[in-house]
Amino acid sequence: MAHKKGASSSRNGRDSNAQRLGVKRFGGQVVLAGEIIVRQRGTHFHPGAGVGRGGDDTLFALVPGAVEFGTRRGRKVINIVAAGE
């Protein structure tokens, strides 16, 4: 088996684009319905009240209000608190 493939070949050339994951709206920030709160792989954060989860585990606001981070049963959850509360 040759370990050198020959002229005009390279084993380099792979540098994938960043996935731009992470928290997009932080605690206390006001969001509208449909705004993305967190882009994630897997459920690092779980959806709470007023928050939906997309097919790629993205969390988004279902109702307008302020973002609130908390825990429930040892899991990190994100809730939307209505402006009047």
Curated annotation (Swiss-Prot):
One of its GO terms (molecular function) is structural constituent of ribosome. This is Large ribosomal subunit protein bL27. The gene is rpmA. Residues 7-19 have a biased composition (Polar residues). It comes from the Bacteria. NCBIfam families: L27. GO terms for biological process: translation. It holds the Pfam family Ribosomal_L27. Keywords: Ribonucleoprotein, Ribosomal protein. PROSITE patterns: RIBOSOMAL_L27. GO terms for cellular component: cytosolic large ribosomal subunit. Belongs to the bacterial ribosomal protein bL27 family. Residues 1-20 are annotated as: Disordered.
